[in-house]
């Protein structure tokens, strides 16, 4: 039978979620910690977004459901330990990788690599759930791989290390590699969600991921785990161990860093809530297309906020990924409609045949 029509409200809810998520990377760029290390700045953001998720999600869920803390605990137990802990771990991996990559390289590079997520989701579904992968998805994967190679080629171009809006060659390359973890971990996360019980709720897993991410960030910062050491950082011997967890004081930037940190923590939670609500009625291929709004607008907002201008290689690779994923999403939607039409025709023929037999 033909697929049911998608309610306009569901589409608008998904679009609203993508639009709310779009400023996330610009807010991340505006968030400055009291450290000169991009590495420790990233973990400071992981700390606040992790514990923010832990603090915000359970109350929001309970208010939306009109439930009690005991009911939230029951939902967590019903989800099962494997999906609760596995989902939390996978979400933590992609979240940490995204924040670290975004602080080491161009936002446009990270978002372009992240946009390949639907392709990886298809391959994960085939590997773990036995779902078929259409030919146009394989073609899109090859084209996107070529575009990502263009992004990586930019990392080997010499650039100045003294420009805070232009990542150094080493950071740029490492950031691109770390960004590859994000769509892979997300693909496994969505596969875990799909393999869970039909009446299961993944919100407890997201809340637990906040505890894992926040605790991990605390260990990295307090344990003084190094990755990169800028010259400015080495010169600043008075820098506190807790500096990565302390946003720039309002006296220095007018409160921009603190406002950006609070806003991004709230906006990401709201954005994924809206996207989840919309995805109940909107086909997954169409949701993937809607999510490309962030790739199209995110780099522009970062440029407007902090003046970060990627090179032409980054723009070329990002444009290639955007065009390829748009074509792939449209092809997937067309496949769903053709399958729906075929089912409708078969049902109509069976109904007509049954009516004829009855009349005879």
Regions found by a protein language model. Name each.
Residues 38-93, 120, 143, 184-192, ...:
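Transmembrane alpha-helices of multi-pass small-molecule transport proteins
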Residues 57, 136-155, 183, 313-332:
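Hydrophobic transmembrane alpha-helices of multi-pass small-molecule transport proteins
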Residues 117-142, 296-315:
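C-terminal transmembrane-helix exit sites in multi-pass transporters
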Residues 9-17, 69-97, 174-182, 238-270, ...:
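Loop-to-transmembrane-helix transition segments
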Residues 20-25, 64-109, 114, 150, ...:
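Specific transmembrane alpha-helical segments of multi-pass solute transporters/efflux pumps
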Residues 48, 108-118, 193-214, 264, ...:
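Helix-helix packing/entry segments at the starts of transmembrane helices
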């Amino acid at each position: 039978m033909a697929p049911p029509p998608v309610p306009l409200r569901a589409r608008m809810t998904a679009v609203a979620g993508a639009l709310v998520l779009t400023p996330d990377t610009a807010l991340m760029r505006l968030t400055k910690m009291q450290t000169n290390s991009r590495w420790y700045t990233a973990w400071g953001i992981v700390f606040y977004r992790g514990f923010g998720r832990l603090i915000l999600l359970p109350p929001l869920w309970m208010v939306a459901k009109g439930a009690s803390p005991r009911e939230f605990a029951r939902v967590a137990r019903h989800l099962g330990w494997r999906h609760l802990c596995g989902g939390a771990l996978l979400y933590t991996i992609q979240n940490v990788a995204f924040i670290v990559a975004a602080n080491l390289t161009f936002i446009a590079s990270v978002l372009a690599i992240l946009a390949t997520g639907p392709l990886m989701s298809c391959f994960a579904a085939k590997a773990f759930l036995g779902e078929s992968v259409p030919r146009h998805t394989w073609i899109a994967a090859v084209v996107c791989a070529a575009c990502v190679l263009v992004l990586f080629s930019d990392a080997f171009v010499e650039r100045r290390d003294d420009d805070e809006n232009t990542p150094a060659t080493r950071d740029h390359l490492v950031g691109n590699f770390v960004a590859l973890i994000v769509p892979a971990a997300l693909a496994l996360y969505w596969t875990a969600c799909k393999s869970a019980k039909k009446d299961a709720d993944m919100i407890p897993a997201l809340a637990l991921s906040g505890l894992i991410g926040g605790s991990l960030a605390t260990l990295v910062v307090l344990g003084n785990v190094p990755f990169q050491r800028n010259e400015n950082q080495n010169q600043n011997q008075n820098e506190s161990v807790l500096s990565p967890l302390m946003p720039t004081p309002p006296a220095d930037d007018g409160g921009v860093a603190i406002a950006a940190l609070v806003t991004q923590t709230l906006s990401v939670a709201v954005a994924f809530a809206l996207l989840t609500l919309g995805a109940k009625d909107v086909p997954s291929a169409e949701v993937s297309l809607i999510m490309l709004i962030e790739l199209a607008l995110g780099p522009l907002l970062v440029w407007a906020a902090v003046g970060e201008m990627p090179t032409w290689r980054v723009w070329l690779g990002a444009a290639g990924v955007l065009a390829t994923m748009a074509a792939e999403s449209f092809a997937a939607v067309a496949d769903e409609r053709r399958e729906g039409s075929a089912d409708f025709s078969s049902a109509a023929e069976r109904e007509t045949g049954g009516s004829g037999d009855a009349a005879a």
